[in-house]
UniProtKB/Swiss-Prot annotation:
GO molecular function: ATP binding; DNA binding; DNA ligase (ATP) activity; metal ion binding
Origin species: Aeropyrum pernix (strain ATCC 700893 / DSM 11879 / JCM 9820 / NBRC 100138 / K1)
A Gene Ontology BP annotation from the UniProt entry: lagging strand elongation
Chain sites annotated for binding ATP: E262, R269, R284, E314, F354, R431, K437
Protein name listed in UniProt: DNA ligase
Cofactor(s) this protein requires: Mg(2+); Mn(2+)
pH dependency: Optimum pH is 7.5.
EC number: 6.5.1.7
Keyword Acetylation: no
Catalytic temperature dependence: Optimum temperature is 70 degrees Celsius.
UniProt entry keywords in alphabetical sequence: ATP-binding, Cell cycle, Cell division, DNA damage, DNA recombination, DNA repair, DNA replication, Ligase, Magnesium, Manganese, Metal-binding, Nucleotide-binding
PANTHER family, per the entry: DNA LIGASE 1 (PTHR45674:SF4), DNA LIGASE 1/3 FAMILY MEMBER (PTHR45674)
Keyword Endoplasmic reticulum (UniProt): no
One Pfam family of this chain: DNA_ligase_A_C
Length: 602
């Protein structure tokens, strides 16, 4: 399949703000894509070479090398490329302009670089992908020159619009405004006959978190082929998500009256896969984090009595002397890429297991929670550092509250309340009332922290002048696949955290508002939705400045957080895992009820 129609689709997507129109455009693109190429097209739309859990290396092409490649491809000087970049602010547009200016496919000479990348023929989707893959896989001595030749050759053969989006892909700034939810909608329209097919496609994706694979199966064999998709060891399952609650009696009513209540540990949620002697560990974001936890690998080898298993648990840092639970920040030292065995000794961990999703060929995701817990108990060999999560089963709000206080006292951040009725299946990738989290009271009107996405930033004044020192934060609206703003956060940062924040933001700054962001506020810099932070505030309030739940409570206003304060970064969460607009609306309504209750009693 030629790459040009894909690049032209990217150009159209960039101009479209309506999710409906985006879905229709994607539907047309998918229908015109051969089944053998559709997986690659989906990966390119996602801006990646494959699912995160595969752990493929990054392309490793910095800005300077990209400038060199553009200059080499179009016989321009690097100084000219840099001048244009400073003027335009986008290397993709620079490549498009130079390609149009210096090349046409009929007149282009075959350079050494073009020969290295394939010889001057029209670009195909597969050639673009394969070349980008080769660039990523080029490692070690001489890899910089290999990357330069491959990329310059690809750009030399690219038409202007193709060059623009190849460069943006390499930069990691594709910016076409399409999330996974929109891709699923389009696959349902293209190959399932309409929206009624989406639940089947989405469930398959939730069980086999590889959107390219799902697209290829549905394109080749139809929606019915996806009904048979089951968990597979080595392929992470998208995690089941919980709603949040505050009142024990209300929570028990929501889950059906009786529930299992477990400690909610302040650590890294982990999905642990075992097949024979091999063990893989995946984060909440489905990233392969096996390297960080060689001790957990050994625990799983010895502590799971099954040939094949997929279990879920929480990895927490513990005190090496007494095994008491340590704060989440201590665990984050495990993210170091070097000296992991030394860090392992300094920061030992414990694993608290709470679910079994697959055991020896049996898919347990369709089984109710009591059966999954029974299977988990059967296969786990407990030790002080590898054990089942602390839990009770109850229908009594008082007992739930007492257990909650005990959890807080013992270092947990709250409890998870889980339904036990016959429909208490594992709803992969779905947030619902089968699980409800009850977290600690932070002694403020806003009873819980929220996880919000950075979409913009502002420069500070005084001693913080010249540095980005406050953030524009957004929630996630899953119905529309967008990020409406909630608040501006300027407090809670230490000087060290500000320095780290500025480094983190560098690679995510973009020249204009991201297509999936809704904002009435113009920050000093726009940031692509990628970073998630935990925020605590005094209360939820109505705001004419923010777009979260706009026009929902009252015309013309949204919901905002008063006196927001930064708590910590949530590296374990993707933007789509952030607190949703539905959750914020529910929190606001509960807050109103608390305020109104005393007046009603008078």
């Amino acid at each position: 399949m030629p790459f040009k129609p894909v690049a032209e689709a990217f150009a159209s997507m960039e101009r479209i703000t309506s999710r409906t129109q985006l879905t229709l455009l994607l539907t047309r693109l998918f229908k015109s894509t051969p089944p053998g190429a559709i997986g690659i097209v989906v990966y390119l739309i996602q801006g990646k070479l494959g699912p995160d859990w595969k752990g493929l290396p990054e392309l490793g092409v910095g800005e300077k090398l990209l400038v060199k490649a553009i200059a080499l491809a179009y016989k321009a000087t690097e100084e000219r490329v840099e001048r244009l970049y400073k003027s335009v602010g986008d290397l993709g547009s620079v490549a498009e302009r130079l390609s149009r200016e210096y090349r046409s496919r009929a007149a282009r000479a075959v350079t050494l670089e073009a020969f290295m990348a394939g010889g001057g023929e029209a670009l195909t989707v597969r050639r673009v992908y394969n070349t980008l893959y080769r660039i990523a896989m080029a490692q070690g001595e001489g890899s910089r020159d290999i990357k330069l030749r491959l990329l310059a050759g690809l750009l030399a053969d690219a038409e202007p619009v193709e060059a623009k989006y190849i460069v943006r892909f390499v930069e990691g700034r594709l910016r076409v405004g399409v999330g996974d939810a929109t891709v699923l909608d389009a696959l349902a329209m293209a190959f399932g006959g309409g929206a009624h097919a989406r639940p089947v496609i989405e469930r398959a994706y939730n069980l086999r978190a590889d959107l390219g694979y799902i697209a290829e199966v549905v394109a080749r064999e139809g929606v019915d082929a996806l009904r048979g998709v089951k968990p597979q060891v080595g392929v992470p399952i998208r995690p089941m998500l919980a709603e949040r609650g505050r009142d024990p009696a209300e929570i028990l009513r929501k889950v059906g009256g009786r529930a299992v209540v477990e400690y909610k540990y302040d650590g890294e949620r982990a999905q642990i896969h075992k097949k024979d002697g091999e063990v893989y560990i995946y984060s909440r974001r489905l990233e392969n984090i096996t390297r960080m936890f060689p001790d957990v690998v050994e625990m799983a080898r010895k502590g799971l009595k099954a040939g094949e298993a997929i279990v879920e648990g929480e990895i927490v840092a513990v005190d090496p002397d007494n095994y008491e639970i340590q704060p989440f920040q201590v665990l984050m030292q495990r993210k170091r890429k070097h000296d992991i065995h030394r860090v392992m000794r300094e920061v030992p961990v414990a694993v608290f297991l709470f679910d079994a999703l697959y055991v020896d060929g049996e898919d347990l995701t369709s089984k109710p929670l009591p059966e999954r817990r029974r299977r988990l108990k059967e296969i786990v060999v407990e030790t002080p550092l590898w054990r089942l999560a602390e839990s009770i089963e109850t229908s009594d709000p008082e007992e739930l509250w007492t257990f909650f206080l005990k959890a807080i006292e013992e270092g947990a951040e709250g409890v998870m309340v889980k339904a036990v009725h016959r429909d208490s299946v594992y709803t992969a990738g779905v947030r619902g009332w089968l699980w409800v989290k009850l977290k600690r009271d932070y002694k403020s009107e806003m009873m819980d922290t929220v996880d919000l996405v950075v979409v913009g930033a502002f420069y500070g004044r005084g001693k913080r002048g010249g540095k980005l020192s406050s953030l524009l934060m957004a929630a996630y609206d899953p119905d529309r696949d967008v990020f409406p703003t909630v608040c501006k956060v300027a407090t809670g940062f230490t000087d060290e955290e500000l320095d780290r924040m500025n480094e983190m933001l560098k690679k995510h700054i973009i020249p204009r508002k991201h297509p999936r962001v809704e904002s009435r506020i113009e920050p000093d810099v726009w940031v692509e939705p990628a970073l998630v932070a935990e925020i605590l505030g005094a209360e939820l309030t109505l705001s004419p400045m923010h777009t979260c739940c706009l026009n929902t409570v009252r015309p013309g206003v949204g919901i905002s957080i008063r006196f927001p304060r930064f708590i910590r970064w949530r590296d374990d969460k993707s933007p789509e895992d952030a607190t949703t607009t539905h959750e914020l609306l529910e929190m606001y309504k509960r807050q109103l009820r608390r305020v109104e209750e005393p007046a009603e009693q008078v």
